[in-house]
């Protein structure tokens, strides 16, 4: 949630940022917040004046009583009594205004950093890095410098490879649950487990503490990280208990620090978690949902950082380097994109996506988003810290990223490593799989 301080002190910058994010009615929304804040401040000013006057009147009452002017003292007492009733009304007005401001601020997204490019959708994102020798603007790919010896004519898509080698049964998942809930079998299941353990081990090497959180959260947690109300329609909701299945471990792990005041010495906090993730993905269809491309349940490792404002940009760079390192070790063709304002998430200030190239599908698949949320999530969470030399608390910066989401990584591994003799396992993964080839 945007801070009122930012909105009041940098109104024009906030409006420009919201417009960059293609938030409709940006100026009207901010004007409405400012109007309610004006009412709150007016009530606060009147309350402060009344309290000051009441203090003076109390001193007058004492003096009048000493002088034997009881009638005058009683008259002032009546005024003070009436003022107390007025003050109660003013306090209620302030509370109502605060509630109204929170209601108005809740659906307003975060504003992007200045370096975020203009643009309305994915086609306006900027490719900032790739390990491909050739990477055209329209998803055309030439030779890539990772495993050039593995290329074969007419590569099969991962859903055909999964069937050929008995790795994943999509039909069985439909029988048990429905579309988007695959069943992993044999080496397919072992590959999943190997990737999870590999990603967690790499996160530990980078200083992340592993958390094993619940995969069901309450509404307050969904609100804290910004999934609610923005993504309510995409989350599975257990209506009887008013619980939500998590779409990402970001939700429970970040909410550990909801309503917490940290000491400066505790920062940065670096946590990671493996969880199953659940997304309704309403409106997805066609090639986007084939095979592992888009699932309702999937495995993902998330990295989460909480840091001081002056350190968060460097923390973001470290997280980007961590995710890139994973893709390098998996020997996959990848690229990194800086998302434009219109393609950013509701809560992010800046976001980079990592995509891997699907050899058989001939297109890029997103496998990670790494975001800095500035104080936006922290303000909703009331996640603060206190500097060693200052009693006043400040909002933390929160960051997170996928490191990594498994389905499309598995798809890319199968497609990009298929040979005439089977599917090769990247060297870094062999200690975790216990086998070098799927045949």
Residue ranges and their predicted role:
Residues 1-135, 140, 145:
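N-terminal alpha-helical targeting/anchoring segments
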Residues 27, 133-439:
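TRNA-recognition modules of translation machinery and tRNA-sensing kinases, especially anticodon-binding
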């Amino acid at each position: 949630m945007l801070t009122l301080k930012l909105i009041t002190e940098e109104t024009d910058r906030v409006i420009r940022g919201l417009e960059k994010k293609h938030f409709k009615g940006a100026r009207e929304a901010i004007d409405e917040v400012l109007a309610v804040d004006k009412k709150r401040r007016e009530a606060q000013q009147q309350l402060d004046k009344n309290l000051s006057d009441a203090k003076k009147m109390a001193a007058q009452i004492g003096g009048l009583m000493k002088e034997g002017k009881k009638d005058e003292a009683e008259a002032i007492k009546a005024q003070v009594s009436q003022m107390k009733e007025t003050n109660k009304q003013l306090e209620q007005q302030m509370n109502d205004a605060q509630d109204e401001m929170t209601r108005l601020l809740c659906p307003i997204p975060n504003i992007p950093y200045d370096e975020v490019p203009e643009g309305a959708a994915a086609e306006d994102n900027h490719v900032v890095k790739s390990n491909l020798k050739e990477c055209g603007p329209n998803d055309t790919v030439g030779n890539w410098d990772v495993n050039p010896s593995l290329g074969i004519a007419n590569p099969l898509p991962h859903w055909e490879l999964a069937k050929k080698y008995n790795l994943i049964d999509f039909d069985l998942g439909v029988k048990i649950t429905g579309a988007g809930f695959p069943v992993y079998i044999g080496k397919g299941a072992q590959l999943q487990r190997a990737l999870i353990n590999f990603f967690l081990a790499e996160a530990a090497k980078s200083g992340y503490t592993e958390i094993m959180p619940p995969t069901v959260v309450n509404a307050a947690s969904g609100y804290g990280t910004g999934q609610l109300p923005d993504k309510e329609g995409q989350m599975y909701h257990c209506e009887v208990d008013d619980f939500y299945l998590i779409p990402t471990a970001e939700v429970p792990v970040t909410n550990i620090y909801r309503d917490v005041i940290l000491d400066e010495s505790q920062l940065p906090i670096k946590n990671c978690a493996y969880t199953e993730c659940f997304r309704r993905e309403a409106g997805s269809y066609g090639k986007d949902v084939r095979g592992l491309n888009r699932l309702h349940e999937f495995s993902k490792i998330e990295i989460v950082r909480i840091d001081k404002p002056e350190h968060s940009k460097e923390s973001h760079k470290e997280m980007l380097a961590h995710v890139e390192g994973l893709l390098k070790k998996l020997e996959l063709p990848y690229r990194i994109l800086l998302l434009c304002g219109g393609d950013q998430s509701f809560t992010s200030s800046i976001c980079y996506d990592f995509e891997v190239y699907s050899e058989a599908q001939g297109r890029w698949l997103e496998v990670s988003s790494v975001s800095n949320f500035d104080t936006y999530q922290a303000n909703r969470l009331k996640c603060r810290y206190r500097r060693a030399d200052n009693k006043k608390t400040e909002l933390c910066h929160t960051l997170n990223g996928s490191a990594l989401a498994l389905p499309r990584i598995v798809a890319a591994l199968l497609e990009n490593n298929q040979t005439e003799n089977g599917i090769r396992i990247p060297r870094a993964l062999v200690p975790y799989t216990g086998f070098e080839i799927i045949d």
